[in-house]
Amino acid sequence: LADSDEGIINYSLQTIPDAPIYDIDGNYATIVREGYTNPNPIALAMLDDILLGRQKLTGNIFFDITPFENLTWRTELGYDISSSKADRYKPMVDLGGWKRSSNESGVQKNSSTFWQFKNYLTYNGNIDDHYFTAMVGQEAWESRYDFTSIFNTGLPSDEVHNPALGTGTPTINSGFGSSAMVSVFTRLTYNYADRYLGTYTYR
């Protein structure tokens, strides 16, 4: 949405500090000097439509069960589901020294999902001053994402922001991907009278 070198943020950083926002007639001003021409970033911020909508659902569910004394089973389920839609429309603009001769419109949609499932089985015990803990576990997760975008120029009206109606050459992009992992692990800890400690972990 920042539009790289032609975005509002970049133009704002490059605008000289004494540049006026409006001219004497109350219109948006553009400063043209020798070796320097930059559009009015305030004008672009007010005239361009840049919208980003996001939806997100995330959470974590867990429970502990103690079937026997000193033995605990813990299960965790986590998830994250998100989607977003970015709409960008730039109308034709004439700021005197700077012009945008063609309008342009772009839409991008993104979605992603993530889930994680864990199980732990832990046993705590002791014999006199010898304390020990044994744990075995399993973990699995998966992540997926996809996106589509379309961009075009030369729309017939500023009222309808639909790239499919543009007379220019449309630019269409899409992509997707996924990753996953499954692992098992164990951990042993030993404590003698709070004087000697030892831990062993394997995944």
Regions found by a protein language model. Give the residues of each.
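Outer-membrane beta-barrel channels and translocator barrels
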Residues: 66-68, 126-128, 193
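Extended, hydrophobic alpha-helical segments in both membrane/secreted and soluble proteins
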Residues: 75, 117, 182-188, 192, ...
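Generic recognition of flexible, low-complexity loop/linker segments
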Residues: 61, 123, 185-187
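Surface-exposed loop/interface segments of Gram-negative outer-membrane beta-barrel transport/assembly proteins
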Residues: 1-56, 74-183
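Membrane-spanning beta-strand positions in outer-membrane beta-barrel proteins
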Residues: 62, 66, 72-76, 131-135, ...
